[in-house]
Structure formats: structure tokens, C-alpha cells
């Protein structure tokens, strides 16, 4: 009679309120201990219906409708754990059979037993072990029968049977099994879901044929019983069966399985959503723990009522104006909120309930100091938000990096005179502004983007004065930032791309934009040698000033229409003279087609309206500004 002990010990997990079976059966030496259960009605109420103690050997399956041992489906175990103990056992016959040896486990017909090919008749000694599981993915109830440690399932709606598990019971090899199942005309392949439901599902008739062919029909009893639900609807087991069926019908009415959540985790999730979005439920037990610890941080067991804030939540929640009613350290806990009114906490944080708040609802806290310091340390004018795109790699150039590149239509003279002080090294050699205006215009005709894009309605002489003044500041600043040696012999490098005409390079200088394209960029300015007399490399240098801002401190600052400041030819043609200026003009005339007549007239007019008179006087004025006393290369 002790053969039932290991079975009951194994299946103790399926007994919801009958744990004393396992504990006593493990220690009991004989069946004499079982009459103790008759004196324990609180533990097992229906003990009087079990009969004498000897009937336990006949009832070898204490979890009659619980799931099997090897492949327990999750829904059935949860169902059986919720059912009272009096619903579990099935009434048994009076024949005495040992627990493990029911039915035919050999795979061969028993002696004296007519083999039932229909699967309707129970083999001698076999008991209908059927479990029902709700298959959520398919929305159907599944009847499950275990044989040889394999759980074979059958659907309730179309009565298809898992052929993969069926042939596994037969001990068939994988290759042969898959070959047979692939040749089936009607089959349903399931690849997602519980393990015992995966596989190839075949119709009921084909499954019965396979079972008869492999001689496993009696092993699978009652899988092929037509009214398999009747075995589940046992009178003693009626309540549990109704629970399973009602749940399956309720699941069908609820809709597709994707919209459903597991039954066990649903109520906490709903409470969590209510506590996050609406007022905190008063029936939740956590708010008293909030005020029971007035001086400490809120405990972690309040996860359902209010989330514990992250480390940086003090700036996210904007406690500058809300810390009086709720603070995470010690203010909100003892602020006089009763245990029954946790709603004040909820109302103070209603607008910042979603943790990543936007700056629209968050006052500037500590997290905004990073942006403010970024604007202040790079020296931008905070009233002009378009400065924020300036590259921060040259922070000391940032104040002058602005208006010409970011579309401010401010006139050049007003910006220079009002907003920017002249640099210290403005006129090297003690030169005055009038001398500078004498000096500049001689070579300014060679700069191809001179003032074609002058502002509408502004005359050229106005621009000349401002332009010369602006060039002088750019010249002085560029002299301080870059010291060009007088005898660098890299003229050939610069000449390779700086002598290209502006039509070849397609510069936008002639169309009035005043900006350079990367094709006209040429090379970096240190490559333009001092002895190279043509002043056109300065046109290419304007792109370098726009892009990298490593030239003068006022390069991009002056005007919308003329971005480069250090565009005077003497900056680069150090060894130039009157002849070099003439040569630049001749080259300019040769390289320019006839289609640019308007620019030609503009250029000559700026040349005619110079302040300094003849060109020779200009070259005399240039002498103090040269970097060195190098002799002219040619005349």
C-alpha cells in the first residue's frame, strides 16, 4: 500500500489545500497514518466522503483534473490551485490497482483484451485522465491526455490533435515523424505558444489512424473519446469544469488575445494605472506608510501608489514652487496630510506626473544651468537665438561670428560702429583712418566680390568708407592672429587653384550673395605666398573665414553682403608694388567674360571714386602696413 506515497509526494503541488498529504506521506511508514486525516476537518473538509483508509490506494490520482507531471500547462495549474480540495478527486471504481500501473504501458495489446481501434472504450484499469487548458492564442479549449510522459492535446472547437506529440508517444524518430506530418494534406503548424501545444496539428480521423497504426490508442485513452468533455463534466468535478468552461467562454467574448492580459496580473496593473493617472485610491494600504515615516525617504513598497523618483527628479519635478507641499526629503511627509487624504500629494504633482516633463511645465531648475552657462561662456548675445549654431571650437571668436552668416539684415556700418569696438591693432604703424581709406581701394578692384551685393538703395561711396574701415579692422586682427612670413615659398601650391578664374570655379561672388562655395575655397591662407602678386587668393580666403573662423576677430561680422574682412591684397602680396597691382588688374580683365558687364562698371566705379587719388600714392601709403621690407619680385 505504500506505493502511493511517491506519487502523492510528487503531485503535492497540484493539491491546493491538501498540503498535509505530502508532509505526512513523506514521513509516514505505513498506511496507518492516514486515519489521522479523519480527525482534521479544518484541513480537508470532505474527508468523510473518502471512505476507509484503504480506499486511498484505489484513488491514485489525487489531482484528478490537475495538469500532468511532465508538461504542465500554465493555465491548468493556476486553475487547479484556485479550486477547493473537495472538487479535485474523481470517484473511482472498487477495483484495486496499483498507482503507476494503469492501462497498457507496453505498447502491445494485453492478453484477454480486445484492442479497441475506435478509442472509445477504456482499457482495463485505465482511468480517464483528462485536463482542460485554455489555449489563449487560438481562443479554444484544449483537452490534454498524458501518455509516456508526453502531453497530447486535442482542440475542442475543431477536434484537431497535435500530431507531433502523438507520434512522440509512439517513440518515432524525428525524421520519420516530420516526414509523415509534412505529407498530411490538412495540417496546422503551430510554432508559437506553450511547448505542449507546438507542433503540427492534424484532423481527428488522421490522428486516430496514426494511433492505431502505432498501437498507442489505448495509451491515449480518453483522447479519442467523442464526448471527451463528458469525462470532464464529472458530477463530483462539476464545479471545476464549469469554472474552466466559463472562463473559456469569457475569453472568447473579450476579443482577440492580443488585447487581453493574463488574468493574474490584471488587478495590480489596473491599480497601478489608476494611481498614476487619477487620484490615488483610498483603499490602497500604502498611503499610511507614507506618513508613518515622517523624516525619511519614502519606502520602496509604495510602488503602486506613487513611483519613487529617480535621483534627478528634484529638477524634473520643479520643486522650486512645489516643495512646500511635497518634498522627497522631509517636508511633504509631515505637512499635515492625514492618512485618509493622500490626494493633496496627487494634486501637487498632477501636472508633472509623467516623469520626463517638458520645459513648458518645469520651472528652470538645476538642469537648465548647463544650457545657460553654455550661452554665456561662449560669449553669444542672448537676444539673438540664431547664434546657437556657431561652432564652439573657437569661443573667443564667437561674438563676431554672427550676423553676416545667419541672415541678420542689419546694415554693415551700424553694426560695426555700434556693437563692436575696433581691435587694438587696428592701424599698424600708427596709421589713421584717412590714410587707410587712401590705401585700400587701389587693390580692392581685384577682389571679385567687392560690393556687388551692396544693400538696396545704398550708394557705393558709402560702402567704400565703411568697407575700408572694416577691412582695416580685419587686417589688423588677422595680423595679430596669423603672422605671415614674408618669404614663404609656397606660391606654386597656392597658384594651382587660386589662379582659377571665378567662372571656372563657379563662385557665387558675381551673383550678389557675397558668400563662397567650397569649390572656391582654394587652400588654407598660409599657403598663399608673399611674393605672389595677384591679389585673387583673398577671394578664396573668404570661405576659409566663413567656415573655420580662424582668421581675424572681425572677419564674419561686418555686413550681410560682404563676409570676408581681411580681403586686402597687400595682406598676401607682401612683395607687391604698383606693377603687381597692374598685373592683377590685367589678369582680372582677361579672366572675366563679357557677360559680367554690370560688375565691370561697378568695379571701375569703385576704382574711380577712391579717396587717395592716383595709384602711386596708394602704394606709398601701403608701405607702413607691409609685414617686411621685401623687394618687389617684378615690376
UniProtKB/Swiss-Prot annotation:
Biased composition (Low complexity): 276-294, 312-325, 356-380
Location of the region described as Disordered in the Swiss-Prot/TrEMBL record: 1-21, 63-82, 246-480, 498-635
A GO term for molecular function: DNA binding
Disruption phenotype: Impairs the ability to undergo asexual reproduction with abnormal morphology of conidiophores and only small numbers of dysmorphic conidia exhibiting precocious germination. Displayed reduced expression of the catalase gene cat1 and hypersusceptibility to hydrogen peroxide. Impairs the production of ergot alkaloids such as chanoclavine-I, festuclavine, fumigaclavine A, fumigaclavine B, and fumigaclavine C. Impairs A.fumigatus immunoglobulin E-independent mast cell degranulation induction.
DNA-binding region, residue range(s): 163-184
Domain annotation HTH APSES-type: ranges: 129-235
Region Nuclear localization domain, residue ranges: 582-605
Residues making up the signal peptide according to the UniProt record: none
Family (UniProt): Belongs to the EFG1/PHD1/stuA family.
Function: Transcription factor that regulates asexual reproduction. Binds the StuA-response elements (StRE) with the consensus sequence 5'-(A/T)CGCG(T/A)N(A/C)-3' at the promoters of target genes. Controls the expression of 6 secondary metabolite biosynthetic clusters including 2 involved in the synthesis of alkaloids (fumigaclavine and fumitremorgen), 2 clusters of the ETP class (gliotoxin and an unknown ETP-like toxin), a cluster predicted to produce pseurotin A, and the product of the last cluster is unknown. Controls the production of ergot alkaloids during conidiophore development.
Designated name of the protein: Cell pattern formation-associated protein stuA
Amino acid at each position: 500500500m505504500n506505493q502511493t506515497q511517491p506519487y502523492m509526494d510528487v503531485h503535492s503541488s497540484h493539491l491546493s489545500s491538501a498540503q498535509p498529504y505530502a508532509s505526512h506521506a513523506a514521513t509516514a511508514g505505513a498506511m496507518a497514518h492516514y486515519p489521522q486525516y479523519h480527525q482534521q476537518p479544518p484541513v480537508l473538509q470532505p474527508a468523510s466522503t473518502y471512505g476507509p483508509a484503504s480506499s486511498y490506494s484505489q484513488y491514485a490520482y489525487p489531482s484528478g483534473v490537475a495538469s500532468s507531471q511532465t508538461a504542465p500547462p500554465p493555465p491548468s495549474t493556476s486553475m487547479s490551485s484556485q479550486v477547493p480540495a473537495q472538487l479535485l478527486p474523481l470517484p473511482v471504481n472498487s477495483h484495486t490497482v496499483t498507482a503507476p500501473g494503469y492501462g497498457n504501458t507496453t505498447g502491445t495489446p494485453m492478453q484477454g483484451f480486445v484492442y479497441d481501434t475506435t478509442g472509445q472504450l477504456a482499457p482495463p484499469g485505465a482511468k480517464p485522465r483528462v485536463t482542460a487548458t485554455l489555449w489563449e492564442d487560438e481562443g479554444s479549449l484544449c483537452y490534454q491526455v498524458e501518455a509516456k510522459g508526453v502531453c497530447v492535446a486535442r482542440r475542442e472547437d475543431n477536434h484537431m490533435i497535435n500530431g507531433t506529440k502523438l507520434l512522440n508517444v509512439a517513440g518515432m524518430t524525428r525524421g520519420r515523424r516530420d516526414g509523415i506530418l509534412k505529407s498530411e494534406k490538412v495540417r496546422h503548424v503551430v510554432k508559437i505558444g506553450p511547448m505542449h501545444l507546438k507542433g503540427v496539428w492534424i484532423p481527428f480521423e488522421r490522428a486516430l489512424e496514426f494511433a492505431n497504426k502505432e498501437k498507442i490508442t489505448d495509451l491515449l485513452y480518453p483522447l479519442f473519446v467523442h464526448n471527451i468533455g463528458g469525462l470532464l463534466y464529472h458530477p463530483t468535478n462539476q464545479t471545476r469544469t464549469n469554472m474552466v468552461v466559463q472562463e473559456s467562454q469569457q475569453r472568447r467574448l473579450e476579443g482577440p488575445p492580443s488585447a487581453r492580459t493574463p488574468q493574474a496580473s490584471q488587478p495590480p496593473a489596473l491599480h497601478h494605472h489608476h494611481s498614476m493617472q487619477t487620484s490615488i485610491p483610498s483603499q490602497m494600504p500604502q498611503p499610511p506608510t507614507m506618513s508613518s515615516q515622517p523624516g525619511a525617504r519614502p519606502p520602496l513598497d509604495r510602488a503602486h501608489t506613487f513611483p519613487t523618483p529617480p535621483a534627478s527628479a528634484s529638477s524634473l519635478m520643479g520643486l522650486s514652487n512645489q516643495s512646500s507641499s511635497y518634498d522627497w526629503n522631509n517636508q511633504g511627509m509631515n505637512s499635515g496630510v492625514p492618512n485618509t487624504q493622500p490626494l493633496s500629494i496627487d494634486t501637487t504633482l498632477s501636472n508633472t506626473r509623467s516623469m520626463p516633463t517638458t520645459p513648458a511645465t518645469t520651472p528652470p531648475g538645476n538642469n537648465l544651468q548647463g544650457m545657460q552657462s553654455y550661452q554665456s561662456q561662449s560669449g553669444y548675445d542672448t537676444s539673438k537665438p540664431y547664434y546657437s549654431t556657431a561652432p564652439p571650437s573657437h569661443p573667443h571668436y564667437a561674438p563676431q561670428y554672427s550676423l553676416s552668416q545667419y541672415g541678420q539684415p542689419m546694415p554693415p556700418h551700424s553694426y560695426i560702429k555700434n556693437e563692436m569696438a575696433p581691435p587694438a591693432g587696428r592701424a599698424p604703424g600708427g596709421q589713421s583712418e584717412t590714410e587707410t581709406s587712401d590705401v585700400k581701394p587701389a587693390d580692392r578692384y581685384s577682389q571679385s566680390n567687392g560690393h556687388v551685393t551692396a544693400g538696396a538703395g545704398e550708394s557705393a561711396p558709402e560702402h567704400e568708407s565703411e568697407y575700408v574701415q572694416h577691412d582695416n579692422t580685419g587686417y589688423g586682427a588677422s595680423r595679430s592672429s596669423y603672422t605671415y612670413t614674408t618669404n614663404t615659398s609656397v606660391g606654386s601650391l597656392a597658384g594651382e587653384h587660386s589662379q582659377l578664374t571665378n567662372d571656372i570655379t563657379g563662385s557665387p561672388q558675381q551673383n550678389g550673395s557675397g558668400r563662397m562655395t567650397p569649390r572656391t575655397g582654394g587652400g588654407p591662407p598660409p599657403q598663399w605666398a608673399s611674393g605672389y602678386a595677384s591679389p585673387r587668393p583673398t577671394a578664396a580666403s573668404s570661405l576659409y573665414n566663413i567656415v573655420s573662423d580662424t582668421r581675424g576677430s572681425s572677419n564674419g561680422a561686418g555686413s550681410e553682403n560682404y563676409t570676408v574682412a581681411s580681403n586686402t591684397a597687400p595682406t598676401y602680396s607682401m612683395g607687391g608694388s604698383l606693377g603687381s597691382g597692374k598685373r592683377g588688374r590685367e589678369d582680372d580683365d582677361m579672366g572675366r567674360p563679357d557677360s559680367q558687364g554690370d560688375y565691370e562698371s561697378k568695379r571701375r566705379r569703385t576704382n574711380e571714386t577712391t579717396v587717395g587719388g592716383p595709384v602711386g600714392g596708394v602704394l606709398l601709403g601701403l608701405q607702413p602696413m607691409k609685414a617686411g621690407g621685401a623687394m618687389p619680385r617684378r615690376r
